[in-house]
Amino acid sequence: TYTAQNERNRRGGEAGRIPAGYRYIGDKCFLNNGKVHEVVLPQECRIIGKQAFEGCQFQKAVDFPEGLLEIKKRAFAENHRLRKVVFPESLERLGAQAYQECNTLRIVKFPNNSRCMVISEAVFDSCVNLTTVRLPFRTQVIERRAFYRCKELREINLPVTVREIGEEAFYFCAMEKLELPPNLKVIGESAFFRCKHLREVYIPESVKKIGRWAFHGCSRLERLEILHDPDEIGPWIINKSCTLVCRKGSKVDHYAKEYGFKCEYVEEMMERKEG
């Protein structure tokens, strides 16, 4: 393990250049270390500890070694100069809040075959200039507040493997288009709250739960299409300016009437097309 004590005791060399042979970068190793503007990780590095580089101000993207398995909680949080992150294919776990409040971060990329299956809680929370995210093909869960208040986030792929989108996961993001994956089961409370650029969203038939306020505050959302009956639909999932497209007599139809939402029936739409 390379620790803060190792760094203090080193003689010569650049701050942030970790000697070969170390597999673990210790918790808080470089916490708020103003001398570190670039980090060079050894090829043997497998784990980056909690808060290891929190508060450092890297001017270059970190070159992660292939073989890195885990980046722990808040490892790179509050780095206000970092612009791009590219993760290695070997990465299996990315800790909560790992890049929280990296407010100049613009691009995040995972290799398609990355082993990372969970996008952890608040991992990119308040990365206010993040515009583009490429998630790995194995992603299954996007946890609570993963992209909370990423207000410039316009482009993100949601792989077909995603089955759960957590509470406030995309709160106040800027996507204009949203293609929900066909195996999605859960849309959490306020998952897309205040995504003000969305205009139309189709809910796949795999979805069993839509949490309250899921699409509330999406002021430009004109249509939300739900052609099946989810097991659970929370209150006020949309604004009253939005139209619910559903099947006549369905649970969704009754839900729309209960909340006074405008409703359009898919059967009538088809009849008009045929006519």
Protein language model features and the residues they cover:
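Structural signature of tandem-repeat unit edges
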Residues: T1-Y2, N9-Y24, G34-I47, Q57-E70, ...
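Consensus positions within tandem repeat domains that build extended binding/scaffold surfaces
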Residues: D27-C29, G49-A52, K73-A75, G95-A98, ...
